[in-house]
Amino acid sequence: MNKIIHWAGRNSLGGLLLLAVVLIVVLPMSLELFRLNLVGKYLCYAFVALGLVMLWGYGGVLSLGQGVFFGLGGYGMAMFLKLEASDPITTRIQTTPGIPDFMDWNQITALPLWWKPFQSFPLTLALILTVPTLLAFIIGFAMFKRRVSGVYFAIITQAVSLILTVLIVGQQGFTGGVNGMTDLKTLLGWDTRTDSAKLILYFVTVGLLLASIVLCTWIQKSKLGTLLLAMRDKEDRVRFSGYDVAMFRVFAFCLAAFLAAVGGALFTLQVGFMSPSLVGIVPSIEMVIFAAVGGRMSLVGAVYGTLLVNYGKSVFSESFPDLWLFMMAAMFLGVVLAFPDGLAGLYTSRVQPLLVRLVHRVRQSRAAPAAPPSPPPVVASSTPSLLDT
């Protein structure tokens, strides 16, 4: 039993299997479809939290601009879905049929050249994965090669998220502006609004999330993961050993961007829209909170942290519409101050030892030999014997 308890610890196969059981069996059987769809949306954010565990927890680099890569992945998928929904027959009432409605409203008469690759689904998938990763490579290479890290890197990533938000809002004729891209209903002719489609998208999201955890766990157990930890704690020693610290950090940043882009694309499929409100500074900071609450050193904990924070956000906003922001802040501060290592640290430092002690006591009580039955008491007979006569 002790092995099972340790087996279910953070970043272990047991923790991954337990999470898989919760996501694949427990939640679909216990939640109605609307709530399950919300969980699927929350799991899209969990991809960003996984990337932050690798970048921040293992690499020691805090990024406050992960919403940029989440938004690029989401907008890439939204562009393909919007073009599919803007076929000439559906948009025949427009001045220029065959282009998105917001382009027609802004008197654009032809599809821009940089939109054309998103008419192909395979090319769209390739761009969703490569464009955010390439942007992360450019930013990371420029910063880490100049040994920019710490709070300076965090501020720069915040600035990038602000720039992208302003760019999206300002180019209303090409991006939909502040309203974003809406009415994204079909994927390759498949209606994503039906109950069966939502259920399928949920399980696809779960499958990709579990695969991402396996990938990140493999990286953590490899020499690369060891080097990331060493660079976080003793950067100069790793550099003096002959390793290029900058390129390893660039890799971690690119991996985090890749995972965030996957989450953004799945988010667009789940909810049917994409807007600049999911790209800016505030959502980027919220994504850091997901990893901090779950535990920035735990992949599985990051998923639980994402679910907990978003579930609390949903409950508080429904029950206390005027106070939910303060309650969310109080929850975050309470968790961070009481448990600096997040939910995963709470499990390993408090819950796991408690379970081990309980199992040990149960074993001791079962292994203790039973006391032999006491002999019956000797009762003196009142009948006189022959020796008394």
Description of each model-found segment:
Residues 1-389:
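Transmembrane alpha-helices and adjacent helix-loop boundaries
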